[in-house]
Curated annotation (Swiss-Prot):
Compartments reported by the entry: Endoplasmic reticulum membrane
Active-site positions on this chain: 240, 372, 448, 546
Protein name per the record: 3-hydroxy-3-methylglutaryl-coenzyme A reductase 3
Chemical reaction(s) catalysed: (R)-mevalonate + 2 NADP(+) + CoA = (3S)-3-hydroxy-3-methylglutaryl-CoA + 2 NADPH + 2 H(+)
Region spans: Disordered: 113-146
Residues covered by region (Linker): 90-145
Alphabetical keyword list: Endoplasmic reticulum, Glycoprotein, Isoprene biosynthesis, Membrane, NADP, Oxidoreductase, Transmembrane, Transmembrane helix
Gene that this polypeptide is encoded by: HMG3
Biological role: Catalyzes the synthesis of mevalonate. The specific precursor of all isoprenoid compounds present in plants.
Length: 561
């Protein structure tokens, strides 16, 4: 079956458009201009032959000839424009190879960013005709006949689902058709998954393939977080009750004690390809070449060609037999930077191939990076932004706001976060619940939630200061991987959350400063969350608070029934 583009729906009454001034159908317009072109051309050719026979100068033209020339030019422009656009569209939409590349090609940016969009308004003017209920016959009756035919072809396997956006030219319509096809194939109800109210064109080829809707997540605000003299209202997307409230209490304690201070220790994204050499000796020669400071300027020049923001910082190598793992680190501006550093690494590998033709590149990523996996190299060397955030909480705030005392908090941190994590053999997990805050902020601001693995590496330290009266608390997070451009940051909801923090988009005056500021806000949020949860544990309030905010008897009754 051939999937055809459907003409756009007519505008609602009262809305005047420019096309309303043309009462003729497009086929009649094409016929008129084609006839005008043929008639004008025939007339001018006849007059040209007559002038040649009578030796009349060709540049002498009458009114009729001028009108014919005007008609010829006007009709030619119209026909070239009309058929030229149709020709280009047919080329773009007819290549099956390009459709395959679109399906399996590498994702751009942070592909797993969640689409946290607001629910559609009750009286939305553009409601979906494909409601997705297996028992809703009325929905099927309202479905256009052409869409019904396409759905049937997708279900039968005649039309691949992944080509719908390309063939139809309407991302919203493609999502609706795919959704209905999935409903019929599975026989499952999905009407609870919203379809309308989301810009599907914004994720095409960038954030998510084969969309059928979007997931709604509530976004809460914790704050103000007083950090480095600025007040931030921190957006957190979560379904865990008590999390935002607890973080908010931590923010209050920090603000009433004068605020927190942060420092960015390092800023560099990494990528580590792995290459195999004929012998271990040969691999060692390549290792020495890469780590020799004499060659760094040349490698840096080759690497930095990938982007005007990419700046190679260093290369760290490790060997396993004759396999060489090369960990490149570079500054990536306000982008999280995985694509940027990967392009730079590819440039260097191509350059090295000239001097080391026996080098066999196994993979652009050899897991020495290390991305989306807990790894000692990230814990020790850092990846992304390495941040330390600290605050001194006054004694009266500990008692009045946190409902505990300094000594109990210090003792709990040692026994739980330090000794307990050591007993568990934790890697980067010397904290109470840093991952909770990191993930909630990541989802709200369009980061890659999977990078919560290394971004949540954190060690929380508590000490009694000022003769034991006040509490010094700090979090050290060596690998916060965030960006303010690319990936899910361009989605409307996530961009709004970034704008709330004042870090939306790239900073033109100081490239990279927006991403670094976002990393410090994440660390500040973790500081607040750690302070509040440890206080709840020390005071024995954890179970009570979760029973109040994280559990509902009404919801439980639904589950039981």
């Amino acid at each position: 079956m051939e999937v055809r583009r459907r003409a756009p729906l007519p505008p609602p009454p009262g809305r005047v458009q420019a096309g309303d001034a043309l009462p003729l159908p497009i086929r009649h317009t094409n016929l008129i201009f084609s006839a005008l072109f043929a008639a004008s051309l025939a007339y001018l050719m006849r007059r040209w032959r007559e002038k040649i026979r009578s030796s009349t100068p060709l540049h002498v033209v009458g009114l009729a000839e001028m009108l014919a020339i005007f008609g010829l030019v006007a009709s030619l422009i119209y026909l070239l424009s009309f058929f030229g656009i149709a020709f280009v569209q047919s080329i773009v939409s007819s290549s099956d190879d390009e459709e395959e590349d679109f399906l399996v090609g590498p994702a751009r940016g942070s592909s797993a960013a969640a689409a946290v969009a607001p629910p559609p308004p009750p009286s939305s003017p553009a409601q979906c005709s494909l409601l997705g209920s297996p028992h809703d016959d009325a929905a099927r009756e309202r479905m256009p006949e052409e869409d019904e035919e396409i759905v049937s072809s997708v279900v039968a396997g005649k039309v691949p689902s992944y080509v719908l956006e390309t063939k139809l030219g309407d991302c919203r319509r493609a999502a609706g058709i795919r959704r209905e096809a999935v409903r019929r194939i599975t026989g499952r109800q999905i009407e609870g998954l919203p379809l309308d109210g989301f810009d599907y064109a914004s994720i095409l080829g960038q954030c998510c393939e084969l969309p059928v809707g979007y997931v709604q997540l509530p976004v809460g605000i914790a704050g103000p977080l007083l950090l480095d003299g600025q007040r931030f209202y921190v957006p957190m997307a979560t379904t865990e009750g008590c999390l935002v409230a607890s973080t908010n209490r931590g923010c209050k304690a920090i603000a009433e004690s004068g605020g927190a201070v942060s420092v960015v220790l390092r800023d560099g994204m990494t990528r580590a390809p792995v290459a195999r050499l004929p012998t271990a000796r040969r691999a060692a020669e390549l290792k020495a070449f890469l780590e020799d400071s004499v060659n760094f300027n040349t490698l840096s020049m080759v690497f930095n060609r990938s982007s005007r923001f990419a700046r190679l910082q260093g290369v760290q190598c490790a060997m396993a037999g004759r396999n060489l793992y090369m960990r490149f680190s570079c500054c990536t501006g306000d982008a999280m930077g995985m694509n940027m550093v990967s392009k730079g690494v590819q440039n260097v590998l191509d350059y090295l191939q000239d001097d080391f033709p026996d080098m066999d590149v196994i993979s652009i990523s050899g897991n020495f990076c290390s991305d989306k996996k807990p790894a000692a190299v990230n814990w020790i060397e850092g990846r992304g932004k390495s941040v330390v955030c600290e605050a001194v909480i006054k004694e009266d705030v500990v008692k009045k706001v946190l409902k505990t005392n300094v000594q109990s908090l210090v003792e709990l941190n040692v026994i739980k976060n330090l000794a307990g994590s050591a007993v568990a053999g934790a890697l980067g997990g010397f904290n109470a619940h840093a991952s909770n805050i990191v993930t909630a902020i990541f989802i709200a601001t369009g980061q890659d939630p999977a990078q919560n693995v290394e971004s949540s590496h954190c060690i929380t330290m508590l000490e009694a200061v000022n003769d034991g009266r006040d509490l010094h608390i700090s979090v050290t997070m060596p690998s916060i991987e965030v960006g303010t451009v690319g990936g899910g940051t361009q989605l409307a909801s996530q961009a709004a959350c970034l704008d709330l923090l004042g870090v939306k988009g790239a900073n033109r005056e100081s490239p990279g400063s927006n991403a670094r500021l976002l990393a410090t806000v994440v660390a500040g949020g973790v500081l607040a969350g750690e302070l509040s949860l440890l206080s709840a544990l020390a005071a024995g309030q954890l179970v009570k608070s979760h029973m109040k905010y994280n559990r509902s008897s009404k919801d439980m009754s639904k589950v039981i029934s």
